[in-house]
Amino acid sequence: MSTRSVSSSSYRRMFGGPGTASRPSSSRSYVTTSTRTYSLGSALRPSTSRSLYASSPGGVYATRSSAVRLRSSVPGVRLLQDSVDFSLADAINTEFKNTRTNEKVELQELNDRFANYIDKVRFLEQQNKILLAELEQLKGQGKSRLGDLYEEEMRELRRQVDQLTNDKARVEVERDNLAEDIMRLREKLQEEMLQREEAENTLQSFRQDVDNASLARLDLERKVESLQEEIAFLKKLHEEEIQELQAQIQEQHVQIDVDVSKPDLTAALRDVRQQYESVAAKNLQEAEEWYKSKFADLSEAANRNNDALRQAKQESTEYRRQVQSLTCEVDALKGTNESLERQMREMEENFAVEAANYQDTIGRLQDEIQNMKEEMARHLREYQDLLNVKMALDIEIATYRKLLEGEESRISLPLPNFSSLNLRETNLDSLPLVDTHSKRTLLIKTVETRDGQVINETSQHHDDLE
């Protein structure tokens, strides 16, 4: 394995090749490799060291040192105490030149990568400035425009809620007043109904009295008819008696004319007639007076009962009219109450719908505020990620700067003069071969993070021989 291939593979493994995109991940792996050093005695120059330090967004760090590797297939050379075989020095110089050429190529590649990273850092800084400007603009807009808009809308909603509360209180007061009026009218209706029942009871009693008076009048009328019939019968009987008496008187008059003288009989008959006529007139006058008195009493009672009946009918008519007017008034109040209750239900439903709409509006505004907060938090997280990337790139730039400074200082060192070396005779075949296999210990540390918090951390050790 050549130095260039080792360095390239290590560089691709640490920083990613041209076709590999560096993607941020929630897991970070730290890989540490042990240092490999190859040396051969004190005749060689100090081992050439090359260190690569890089920091990628994924968080991978690696160090690696390599030295000039001597092949075991170099032919054995016998070195004398006072002479040097320059073929070995030529081979070393050739290999050193090749190594320097490879190092120059690698440095050129590193410079290109470094330029790309600088461009990337500048681009990320510009993006960072743009995001900061957008964040400041969003903060200013959120404080100026959205805050004022929300405050104005909240004031309007509060004003509408206060107005609706006042309207509701006014409607409730009107409802209470109407309820009191209805209760008062109901009490008045109950009183009128009681008075109506009393009037009906009085009317019923009056009707019973009228019926009794009518029965009494009919009885009296029947009695009057019977008395009139009796009077007619008595008149007829009296006339018959008078006729009989006149017949008897005439018969007696005839007999008296025969027996006695005429003037004495006439006077007697006149006296008898006068007596009977006086008795009949007296009886007739008494009967007429009794009939007239009874008829007057019955007429007066009938008139009195008729007046009471007429008054009762008038009172009943008045009570019926009052009951009808009160019934109409109660029906009107019931209609008014139903309309007010319907209006109140409609207003309550409207209030409920408007309150639900206001709650939905408030919820929507709160959701928008929450979304804006989440978006601001996301921008802040992106800004923090960009800051982390920038810090990693700053560290990488500093590492490249140290690399360049180290390479410049190493390149400025003088080459050793192999012609002036005083080597003693040594058989290279007797020397132990350089162990071309080295032991490398890999420490793989995996850290899993979520939302900036460490949720899992594992470490693994691997031994690798090359």
From Swiss-Prot:
- The answer to whether the entry has keyword Nucleus is yes
Region annotation (Head) maps to 2-95
What is the reported tissue distribution?
Highly expressed in fibroblasts, some expression in T- and B-lymphocytes, and little or no expression in Burkitt's lymphoma cell lines. Expressed in many hormone-independent mammary carcinoma cell lines.
Q: InterPro entries this protein is in?
A: IF_conserved, IF_rod_dom, Intermed_filament_DNA-bd, Intermediate_filament
Give the N6-acetyllysine positions (modified residues).
Answer: K120, K129, K139, K168, K188, K223, K235, K294, K373, K445
Q: Enter cross-link residues for Glycyl lysine isopeptide (Lys-Gly) (interchain with G-Cter in SUMO2).
A: K104, K120, K129, K139, K223, K262, K294, K313, K373, K439, K445
Renumbered residue ranges of the record's region Coil 1B: 154-245
Motif, [IL]-x-C-x-x-[DE] motif: chain positions? 326-329
GO CC terms in record? axon; cell leading edge; cytoplasm; cytoskeleton; cytosol; extracellular exosome; focal adhesion; intermediate filament
* Cellular compartments annotated: Cytoplasm; Cytoplasm, Cytoskeleton; Nucleus matrix; Cell membrane
Q: Which GO terms describe its biological process?
A: astrocyte development; Bergmann glial cell differentiation; cellular response to lipopolysaccharide; cellular response to muramyl dipeptide; cellular response to type II interferon; intermediate filament organization; lens fiber cell development; negative regulation of neuron projection development
Q: How is it modified after translation?
A: Filament disassembly during mitosis is promoted by phosphorylation at Ser-55 as well as by nestin. One of the most prominent phosphoproteins in various cells of mesenchymal origin. Phosphorylation is enhanced during cell division, at which time vimentin filaments are significantly reorganized. Phosphorylation by PKN1 inhibits the formation of filaments. Phosphorylated at Ser-56 by CDK5 during neutrophil secretion in the cytoplasm. Phosphorylated by STK33. Phosphorylated on tyrosine residues by SRMS.
- Entry's Gene Ontology molecular function annotations: double-stranded RNA binding; identical protein binding; keratin filament binding; molecular adaptor activity; protein domain specific binding; scaffold protein binding; structural constituent of cytoskeleton; structural constituent of eye lens
Protein name as annotated: Vimentin
Q: Which gene encodes it?
A: VIM
